[in-house]
Design a protein with these regions (language model features):
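Conserved, single-site charged/polar hotspot
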Residues: 1-192
Length: 192
């Protein structure tokens, strides 16, 4: 991720088409490829591509749902000619800032952590990862007939948080706070 302690340069290889866009003093290199090919890279980059088939299938559905939800939101905002998205809130006592897909408008998603980790075909896609994508092609998570914003964390530390406490104040009834541990284990969050 950009400006994270694990930021590093890496040589990567991509498939698909390359589109260059000049915006002010920057040149953006955009990789254009089919959704399912993108997902093969994501599930091989976000987690171990040698994980069990069922875990890879679950991740495929989650990542596909998140991606299609973001594209749908982006298209709606373009159709409404709306630039009303702010990735921060400010009160007299605090400023809360989060990084989101809306922080870029020239392309659907990026390879940074606020979107999904995408590293092209550099990491190699295992037969199980390819099988997971193929067996779940087109499958998404729905809530009230809408594609879910299926955000996830690679490492939750034993607890998840409600959507509105991490991103914009727009609660999602399917993204709730849960403990992710053995039954009966107490988690000490006093030093968090």
């Amino acid at each position: 991720g950009i400006n994270f302690h694990w930021e590093r340069n890496e040589e990567q290889t991509f498939e698909g088409a390359l589109k260059l866009i000049i915006d002010s003093d920057k040149i953006w290199a955009i990789n254009i490829l089919p959704l399912e090919n993108y997902l093969s890279s994501v599930i091989s980059s976000e987690m171990s591509a040698t994980s069990s088939l069922e875990l890879l299938k679950a991740h495929s559905v989650i990542s596909r749902s998140w991606l299609l939800n973001q594209i749908e939101k982006h298209n709606q905002s373009k159709n409404e000619h709306s630039n009303n998205f702010f990735s921060f809130t400010k009160t007299d006592k605090e400023i809360v800032r989060w990084y989101d897909r809306e922080d870029h408008s020239l392309f659907d998603v990026c390879a940074d952590d606020h979107c999904q980790r995408y590293q092209g075909i550099s990491k190699g896609i295992t037969p199980n990862a390819a099988k997971a994508i193929k067996e779940t092609t087109g499958e998404v998570l729905l809530s009230n007939n809408e594609i879910c914003d299926a955000r996830f964390s690679k490492c939750c530390g034993g607890a998840t948080e409600e959507y509105q406490y991490c991103w914009d104040n727009n609660p999602k009834d399917y993204l709730i706070a849960l403990k992710d541990d053995k039954e009966g284990t107490e988690i000490d969050l006093t030093s968090e």
